[in-house]
Amino acid sequence: MINLSRLITGVLVSVLALAAARCPAAESPGHAADGGRERVSLQEAFRRPPDAVKPWAYWWWIKGNVDEASITHDLEAMKRKGFAGLLMFDARGYHEDHVPPPPSRMDFMSPEWRRMLRFAMTEADRLGLQMSVNLSSCAGALKGPWEVGDDAPKKLIWTSAEVQGPKCLQCELAREGEDRRWDVALLAARHDGQAGAKTSAGAAASEAVSLSDAWQDVQDKPTSKSPVVEVVDISGKVDANGRLTWDVPEGRWTLVRFACVIMEGHEYDVDILHEKAVEAYFERMGKALLDDAGPLAGKTLTHFYSVSWEGAAPTWSLGFERQFERYRGYAPQAYLPVLAGMTVESPGVSDRFLRDYHKTLGDCFMNHCYGKLRELCNRAGLKWHSESGGPWNRKIPDFQHADQLAFLGRNDMPQGEFWYPTRGLNRPPAMAAHVYGRPLAATESFTHMRQHWCAYPAAIKPDADAAFCDGVNHFIWHTFSASPPEFGKPGIEYFAGTHVNPNVTWFEQAGPLLAYLARCQLMLRQGRFAADVCCYTGDKPYLHWGRGEKWNANPTLVLGKGYAYDLVNTEVLLERTSVQDGDLVLPDGMRYRVLVVDLEDETVPPRAMRRIVELAEAGATIVLGQRRPTRAPGLRDYPTCDEEVVRLAKRLWGPEGAKAGRRSLGQGKIIVGTEIDDALQAKGIPRDFEGPWHYIHRRLGDGDVYFVAGSGQAECTFRTSGKEPELWDPATGAIRDAVWYRATDDGRTVVPIRLPENGSTFVVFRRPAEPRHVVSVVGPEEGVETASQMEIERRSDAGAQLRLWRKGPYVLETSGGERVAFEAAAPPEPIALAGPWEVRFAPEWGGPESITFDTLTPWNEHPNDGVRYYSGTAGYRTKFALDAAQASGLVRLALGQVGQVAEVRVNGRALGVVWTAPWTVDLTGRVKPGENELEIDVTNVWVNRLIGDSRLPPEKRLTKSNVRLFRETDKYRRFQGFSPKDALMPSGLIGPVRLEFGSRQEARF
């Protein structure tokens, strides 16, 4: 494996300034290979992406349905198509009602299962693939195929009874350990003289007291109106035989007994709040897999993994009260009645305790599960990656006050996810990677929650581009399912995902898409993310599905387009920030020009407020939102903590009612009541990017890499100057000088760019600008549209080599003020290739062996059922004649509409796969005067064949899969198969297909 680690760490920064420099490539998700291996230039790595920057795939074992032959077949296919690694995942019992899986072939972690996994590791090693394994028998939880006894997750329960004092109370309690119940506390809560709530047992005060039955789950918030004015811990009044003896003082008291029990139905799950339980689980499963890997651990088996959290949400754990005191600074027992619905002291105090309780649940989950697993993996020579609780349901107690960034920061490789189409959760893991110094931000890619096999390369590309712009740089494609031959085609599948295994019709054409992803990942691992702003929103930063347009649910400030930001949390603010030259900097090199404090609510920890003041005094510029903090969270040091927050808020925001404006604090600047964009521009920081498209910017030591994605033509402005822009096309690997650009008065560079539909490009600034370049072009059609008429192919010794597709006058103006005018001759007229076309289908998939299309017709509209319901590859063949003038100039083949990918050959020469716009192929130098033969193999998706088969009895169907339609009214209809009522997808070569001609012209300047 080529060692790519130094590109990530920034050693390559100086390399990028030199076009001919040699350099190592970017870090792979696993461990770096031997540094003595071959080094490649960045340009060469871009043209031919090395393994270390290629994407991975989720490799699903559907209930252990694999064998040695299928394992070898799958892994060889991954390697051949351009995957560099795999995440092995055998999940059982997860949404099996959506798409029922086949029967289990072998039990999870059984000797045969482990033998298959060992074989997979050796095959991956043979092929040079890296491997991660999901450390669970289930998706969405941490569990194995065995009951874990007392290590299972627990919930807090309570029961209560009312007594009236004074009196001597004696009663029998069921002893701890009965029914696997652990006592937590026995408390007596005195009310303020008003009638108390009814007891859970329904007993009156004069009746016998029972505290051993009628258990209830804890409550989310207090329901009683009368506050508890005193809480007494009477746990010590219970003797070894479970007999309570207590002299009840005067007053109305509620006795509340708290205990924890294992959550019903979760006897196989692990208590994620308990460090020892998690460690025992790792020792049982992780250690076994490490033993099986032997010398491949850390070499081929590089990671363990956990997916999004959808498992048990425990509300207590053994020893939780000690962890509470450790994290919150006080013992919780006096406030536990709040969890039984009582108000202790006041509603405000009760709310603060609830916040502390939920925060502690999150901290235990974060540190004792994810943090511990990372520690254990690292100790074993592996890395840990997970989605750290995503997709982050704030209704779950463990996540209500959790710090999303800190959760993700407990990974060696933070991971998010995005769904096709247009649903993403990529910004949080990218931000966590930036602020915690992790070089890679991963994403579960292309998860699909609709009917299967509808997706194809051109359709999913926009979502990939959006994820890249959101900051992730390592794709793990979801999903590549293991499906041995006996399951037929399309075969067995998991209920969700964009499928990409060899049973997928377009799998053999997937290589260029995977190379595209690899090139993007290579470039987005260079240098560091460029963001002008870091934003602190409070003690529980959180972003849900979306692009991070808002940094909290209630923003008072908005960052304008063309500026980028990262969230920072309290942990990073306290432990990783410093000020250099007025910028906020992190130990790993991230640098922000401005700290924004835009709070989600009025609650801030005093230590965070102190740190913000310290940063300002050290020289930072801080922009404050309208929401002024008034209190601290929780009960630590209450009420003096609130007083400190108010005092520090006054130092930052000024006195109540103070006017907006700018003022100094120490060496720094405080800005209140001003838009962030205005504050940045006042510091001489113009927008980083201006244009109609999505973008991301990576800053190098002496250069810049921008990725832009969108459709159409535009003049784009980049905040860099004195550098020659280059356009690096990730779809083809082509690199060319832009040549046409101009400098602005505010130190930026404007580059006209033309993108096809859902197109993208990298704009790289690394070399000093040439003394002469083109600053404007006027063609037959004025304005930036000229980019569609003229392409600057490359620089030449005399100026620039142009490709022209329109006749007429062109005028180029250079940076030296020179005007270069010329008249382009009319190119030959385009040739329409309407037909006839000979088309060959695969009879084994229901198509005619050969048929003639007089004109191009979508397969789904053809009268022949064998064509209309066909899925797979069909070969088109036609001939065309060119004269000498046509054959000697520029020639391109425009395919028009394609459903869904095409491979082109001219005169027997393969010209590659066409999978995305502009759906053209360069034929220059590949055609000849006279007759030429054109062959186009077109591949569609499985949909039409599956719809056709749904019309047939099972024994006559050509396809076979566990994904089938059960009932039209089934609530899981969208996850299932097809019916005759479903619409066919446009398929085949739809066109119009034509040959277009142009000419070359050298512009001298």
Which residue stretches match the model-derived regions?
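Bacterial N-terminal signal peptides
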Residues: 9-19
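Boundary at the C-terminal end of the N-terminal hydrophobic targeting segment
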Residues: 20, 25-27, 32
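Mature N-terminal segment immediately following signal peptide/propeptide cleavage
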Residues: 38-85
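Carbohydrate-binding surfaces of carbohydrate-active enzymes
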Residues: 56, 72, 85-86, 105-139, ...
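Acidic/aromatic-lined carbohydrate-recognition and catalytic surfaces
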Residues: 91-234, 258, 266
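Short acidic/polar inter-strand loop motif in beta-rich domains
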Residues: 263, 770, 816-820, 939-948
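Aromatic-lined ligand-binding clefts that engage carbohydrates, nucleic acids, or primary amines
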Residues: 717, 880-907, 914-915, 934-938
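Short, well-structured beta-strand segments enriched in hydrophobic/aromatic residues
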Residues: 891, 929-956, 960
